[in-house]
Amino acid sequence: LWNYAILPMGETPEKDDGQILVPFAVESSLSGVGKRLGDRNELWYNRTFTVSPKWNGKRVLLHFGAVDWKADVWVNGVCVGTHTGGFTPFEFDITAALKKGDNELKVRVWDPTDAGCQPRGKQVNRPEGIWYTPVSGIWQTVWLEAVPQQYIRNIRTTPDLDRKLFRVETAACGAQPGDVIEVRLYDNGTKVAEGRALSGAPVE
């Protein structure tokens, strides 16, 4: 359970309204709240968490599966990032904001629903005909991940059947000039291809 508060835009909570079960939207009864947010209010979440001593020396990433719609995130009072968009996952490197013991996580969410210009599907503030309510706030899983100081953040693969090639593009964090990315392609445990390229360049 997380703590939550609903306040007019621009105001900061001095106390919580109650608790909310994440990752259910605040409008959902499954969240334990079942309240409408509206485009003139903001939804605040807060909770504490600890980081395992086994993660010392590693980078710590805070992942959100999805938050509808605009999210601002703080760890121990430090703004670690902002994300806009209700349907895509995102993460922030929160290593520099962490401390020993309890860490405080705060998330501020604004969701104008049909008062804004974002894609919203069937979500409307005043449903008629169908009773599909807005889906505001954290509605997918939130989790922490420990990664090495150098790690691959994302991989994009593109097969080229005409040229009999397999193109791999990587986004490496913490890579140094001259670092090499090496890719091996296996088919049922048998290596069928391999390639090397400098970090930032595609491997074919």
Language model: regions and residue ranges:
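Ser/Thr- and Asn-enriched, surface-exposed coil loops between beta-strands
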Residues: 86, 158-164, 199-201
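Solvent-exposed edge beta-strands and adjacent loop segments
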Residues: 21-30
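Accessory beta-strand-rich segments of carbohydrate-active enzymes
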Residues: 5-9, 35-152, 175, 188-192, ...
